[in-house]
Structure formats: C-alpha cells, structure tokens
Design a protein with these regions (language model features):
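Conserved SGNH/GDSL esterase-like catalytic core that processes O-acyl groups on lipids
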Residues: 22-27, 32-116, 153
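Catalytic His-Asp segment of secreted/periplasmic serine-dependent ester chemistry enzymes
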Residues: 38, 140-212
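Alpha/beta-hydrolase-fold catalytic nucleophile elbow
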Residues: 98, 137-138
C-alpha cells in the first residue's frame, strides 16, 4: 500500500513537471480523506474520485493521514506527518482542508487551540510559492459517537470556528456536514464513508471547485 501511494505521488509530480496547464489539488485530511476502510484506498478514496470527476485539467493528491488532528497538541497532529510535508513539495494550486473529526475526542478538544492552530495552518499554506487557493470543509456528520468522536462537538465547536475563519480569511466553505446528513446508512462505522458516500463527497467538492 505504501509503495502504491509513493508511485502515485511520484506520477503526480511528473505530471506537474510536464504541464503548467494542469491545476494541482492537495487534499489535506484524516482517515476520511485517506480512505480508511475502503477496499482499495489508492483507487476509491475521495481524492481519487475527485480526480476522476474533474478530469485531465486537474491532478489531485491524496494527502490524508489516518487518526490525525488539526490541533498541534492532539494525540496525533497532522503537522508532524510526511503528508503535511508532501503538500509543500507538490506546490498545489488548490488546497482542500478537511480536518476536525479526531479533534472532537474529549482528550483532544480545546476550542481556543483548534481555532489558533487552524489559522496557523491557513497561514502556513499561504506561504507556498504556488499561492494556493484554500477551501475549508465542514466535517461530515458523526452518526454515532465512537472512540470519543462525536457530532455535538462537530456542530457546536468545529463548524462555528471553521465558518468564522473562512469569513476572516475570505475562504470558500464546502459543507460536507449538510451535504452528507442523510447518508448515515453509507457510513459503515458511523464515522467513515463507504464507496458510495465517498463518491458523493467527491461530487460535492467538485461542484464547488468547478463553480470558481
């Protein structure tokens, strides 16, 4: 699996070098982005589906890492992962941030730190030489509390902060919480989407990007 992701990353870099007309998209996120639980992550994750929907004018990098938090002092910060570093190497034109689900765990959740670190991530990505356009995703619903992950914190904590920062930084919001609210049957463990739900997520994101 690791080799397949490395080859995909390498092929995307080669594609970038071959054509300046291809818009590069980096999908930043946790296990929902990486494709946890899907039969073949490297072929059915939402970034792969997004790449298929958008077509040859776009090249999409899956930069998701399972179990990660946006908060720097969470139990597994995205900041320390190679996937975070890969975003800078890739020099994307567009970055899609979908982080927050694991931050809702009681041992992780600190509203002030989440807001502070989310702003820091936005500011850090803005330093990339390609000057990427940043989209922020409202997390998909948590249909049943599990591992401490809960929808109450998503609704009352995560979403208001993301909306506040989007307004402050003039960023586009992709509402996956509302968009996937009726799809509980397609979240196999109440948190992670199956192949059908992944395709729906990709379609929602593609529609938002295509309108620009």
């Amino acid at each position: 699996m690791k080799n397949s992701y490395f080859l995909l990353f390498l092929s995307l870099l080669i594609m970038v070098g071959c054509s300046d007309k291809v818009l590069r998209i980096a999908c930043v996120g946790d296990s929902i982005t990486e494709g946890y639980g899907l039969a073949v992550q490297s072929k059915t994750s939402y970034p792969i589906m997004l790449d298929s929907i958008l077509g040859p004018k776009y090249a999409v990098l899956n930069s998701g890492r399972s179990a990660t938090t946006l908060q720097k002092k969470g139990d597994f910060p995205y900041w320390i992962c190679k996937e975070f570093s890969n975003v800078f190497v890739y020099k994307p034109n567009i970055i899609i941030i979908k982080l927050g689900t694991n931050d809702t765990k009681p041992n992780n959740w600190h509203a002030d730190k989440y807001e502070q670190d989310y702003q820091a991530m936005i500011d850090t990505f803005k330093t990339i030489s390609s000057k990427p356009e940043i989209y922020v995703c409202l997390p998909v619903p948590v249909f049943k509390t599990k591992w401490g992950i809960n929808d109450s914190t998503v609704v009352h904590g995560i979403i208001p902060i993301i909306e506040k920062l989007a307004k402050k930084n003039k960023l586009s919001v992709i509402d996956l919480h509302k968009g996937m609210s009726n799809e509980g049957v397609n979240f196999f463990d109440s948190i992670h989407p199956n192949e059908k739900a992944v395709k729906m997520m990709a379609a929602i994101i593609a529609e938002k990007i295509s309108k620009k």
